Amino acid sequence: MKLLSKVFVTALGLTSIVNAAPTSSSSAEEAQKTVPVELSIGVKQLPNIHNDSAVDANAVAKGYSLVNVSLTARGLTGILKLKEATNIYGYDFEYLNLSVEYQSDTRLNVHIEPTDLTDVFVLPEELVVKPKLEGDAKTFNFENSDLVFEYDEEDFGFEVLRSSTREVLFSTKGNPLVFSNQFIQFNTTLPKGHSITGLGESIHGSLNEPGVVKTLYANDIADPIDGNIYGVHPVYYDQRYNTNTTHAVYWRTSAIQEVVVGETSLTWRALSGVIDLYFFSGPDPKDVIQQYVSEIGLPAMQPYWALGYHQCRWGYDTVESLETVVENFKKFDIPLETIWSDIDYMDGYKDFTNDPYRFPTDKFRKFLDDLHNNSQHYVPIFDAAIYVPNPNNATDNDYEPFHLGNESDVFLKNPDGSLYIGAVWPGYTVFPDFLANNTQEYWNKMFKDWYERIPFDGIWTDMNEVSSFCVGSCGTGRYFDNPVHPPFEVGYSGSDYPLGFDKSNASEWKSISEAAAATKTTTTTSSSTSTSIDGKNTLAPGKGNINYPPYAINNNQGDHDLATHAISPNATHADGTVEYDIHNIYGLIQERAIYEALLEIHPNKRPFIIGRSSFAGSGKYMGHWGGDNYADYYMMYFSIPQALSMGLSGIPFFGVDACGFNGNTDMELCSRWMQLASFFPFYRNHNVLGAIPQEPYVWEGVMNATKTSINVRYSLLPYYYTLLHESHVTGIPIMRAFNWQFPYSKELAGVDTQFFVGDALLVTPVLEPGVNHTKGVFPGENAVYYDFYTHKKQKFTAGKNETLAAPLGHIPLHIKGGNIIPTQEPGYTTTESRKNPFGLLVALDAEGTASGKLYLDDGESVDVEEALYVDFVASKNKLVASVFGEYEVRQPLANVTILGVDSEPKKVLFNNETVSHNYENGAVYLTDLEKFTKEGAFAEEFSIQW
């Protein structure tokens, strides 16, 4: 294999060296074989949405009629009888069972499944939680429901209406239901000019405008615009400004899906399973988010340290390189909470290992001990596949994770019962089967043994869509070649830079361009147009052709094959379930297993997991990062709607690779991005092997911008932690879209270049190169906004697009009046910060009122025994802090700043004692309050009058 060249970058007197890490230090790389490229090429598919000759199911299907309707205590049941079989994409089911259930005043379930469930996959509750009935069946009265179910019998169709207004929220009437073994389709009407959000995960703006086609199939691919990527969230939110209401529709299915958003309709398709629809009535956006997320699983409460700054890259290939990065952060006084490793630390890229030469255990542990002694943390990457050792190589064959797993029968199989062997980073690999009886026990042991050698603080799960670099069980009969190299060049060797680089770095750009031209060759890579044949491409009994189903979705891989960069749909689990039916939840069930394994290591310590693939309910176990983005401005912009979409999906702890993962960044982009990313819940810088270094100390400008933003972030840690807790108990996201905050203003529906953090902070980033200003809207009639840095009240017109000064190194940040923000003096780590004095930032609204909350606990316990809750209320020139809970905070209150005070007060009282104050530009500053709060800032209730 050709090694990538070294990249030398001089940064502030330092020389950083980034190497392409060898696959293993213990084997000669030149002797290593490669997975044959032809094994990575799938059978070319033509997606139906691009096939002009494809049959339109709506035009052909005859639908069903409804018979034998019976009322129940909670709704009704009935039988759907097929009017005429058309067998468009599979065979039609003749009889279906219909069940309608009013589950609560705000939730309705419509469930349709074949009467004969032979060979039909019904998603078990053990894999994906089912919303529960609320109330006593004997006393429940569905006439009190916010929702009403109505139906037509002869040509079956149904409507869900809002009971208070009779507004139709969902209607299939006039469109035939299609329900076959490999194709389910229904259509609903939408109002013209609709505002549809959700249906993640994809790189797209916040709104799903007419013409959007969402492919819901978990996919290992580097963040394409509009294509299917890592996660699947089958829920949409319909915000209607004519009635000022919002509702949500959730299809509880793990099937392969496709959603087509039209001008006045939405078509939803699935390639297996049953219809299990849940309607949430809202009526406000936050209401409906809370209703949905509460049912799929409230988000995990993250440890306090998770809110610190995280640094990573693919290319930290020795213990010494990690040590150097940590030392450089300290040298330049840039706060660093957590250092991460990509696959470099592994021995031959194998899970549960560390390279004996580059990451020897004794040296590695010494580094981690030093890190922990400084209250810092370490998180390694962990891939989904387990290496199959070469039985002809005694050294290679000594790999317990495979042998124990194989003996315990915990790996996925081919339909014939043999091991399904794909290919990932270490070579030919097998894949844990989380439906097998012994997998959790095996998983617990592997993680515990690994932790005893390498005491990590969290886990970063990757490649868990689940991904494979070849099509089908390509390692069957080939694992004797292990270790083998992936069928592509590893890392990045290009010379592309972000938009605007040629102008802002003209001399450097000239030399790069000349060097690229000098080394450019006319060599081209041939590409095969032939299709490969999957030897296991057989018809699954009773299910049809599941590797190549009759309806082809637009899977965003070059050949659209479902098995490209994935394991084949016919890979089989211990209970007979095939991947075709549950591919989309592999990440969810793997991350849940890791969560349980980490609890085995530390029974009452919050597991910290950042995962790539996700599904409805994943937020209960993990946070999420946005995957392999690109170092360019358009990707920086898309990080905002991606974050907002994840919030809607119940995963509020989200961030992206700041400065970009793929390609080379530059000083300007990295400065802007490091400041924007500092307001995301998860804050990490990460990039690809072979690209230039992009740690914030590489450029002085980036370093200064980063220090400024980390200082702001760390001062706001109590506020962020309070928002984490709010999200944990209610499901309300931390980052908030304009249309959630101001649901009655349709002109704000598509705003996703700005966002709120909680209710209090408005972030307006610069998202383009070469400018020293940005534009932003400040919504809300009579709303008051203050500049976060100067504390000055701003003179903005509600809804107007304002121009804001934003020189490089500055990101506009405003406080919305009516909020009280708890703060704390920032330290180098979150642990240091927690030892420092508190402050309060009070931003009065136009009526002179404000409110806020503070939540604190020990920052790590799963079962919190002692917590502190503080409610802040300001009104009529008086602030009152009401304290609840037993958690003891010894740090004093040092300062309080009150914004929006029209005239200087004659005196200020703290618990009726006069305190000194300063007054400037409408702000009252109180300092030296420690003497009043020696027992702790929130040891008791206090008041401030002015």
Curated annotation (Swiss-Prot):
Fetch the SUPFAM superfamilies from UniProt: (Trans)glycosidases, Galactose mutarotase-like, Glycosyl hydrolase domain
Question: What does UniProt list as catalytic?
Answer: D462, E465, D628
UniProt xrefs under Gene3D superfamilies: Glycosidases (3.20.20.80), glycosyl hydrolase (family 31) (2.60.40.1760), Golgi alpha-mannosidase II (2.60.40.1180)
Q: Does the keyword RNA-binding apply?
A: no
Per the record, GO CC terms? extracellular region; membrane
Q: Any signal peptide, and if so, which residues?
A: 1-20
What is the top EC class of this enzyme, as a single word?
A: hydrolase
Q: What is its main location?
A: secreted
Compartments reported by the entry: Secreted, Cell wall; Membrane
State its Enzyme Commission number(s).
Answer: 3.2.1.3
Q: Which InterPro entries match?
A: Gal_mutarotase_sf_dom, Glyco_hydro_31_AS, Glyco_hydro_31_C, Glyco_hydro_31_CS, Glyco_hydro_31_TIM, Glyco_hydro_b, Glycoside_hydrolase_SF
PTM text: The N-terminus is blocked.
Task: Please give the Pfam families that the UniProt record associates with this protein.
Answer: Glyco_hydro_31_2nd (PF01055), Glyco_hydro_31_3rd (PF21365)
Q: Name one GO molecular function term.
A: glucan 1,4-alpha-glucosidase activity
Question: Which reaction is the catalytic activity of this chain?
Answer: Hydrolysis of terminal (1->4)-linked alpha-D-glucose residues successively from non-reducing ends of the chains with release of beta-D-glucose
Is Glycoprotein among this UniProt entry's keywords?
A: yes
Q: Which PANTHER family match?
A: ALPHA-GLUCOSIDASE, P-TYPE DOMAIN-CONTAINING PROTEIN
Would you identify the family this protein belongs to, as annotated?
Belongs to the glycosyl hydrolase 31 family.
Protein name per Swiss-Prot or TrEMBL: Glucoamylase 1
Q: What is the organism of origin for this protein?
A: Candida albicans (strain SC5314 / ATCC MYA-2876) (Yeast)
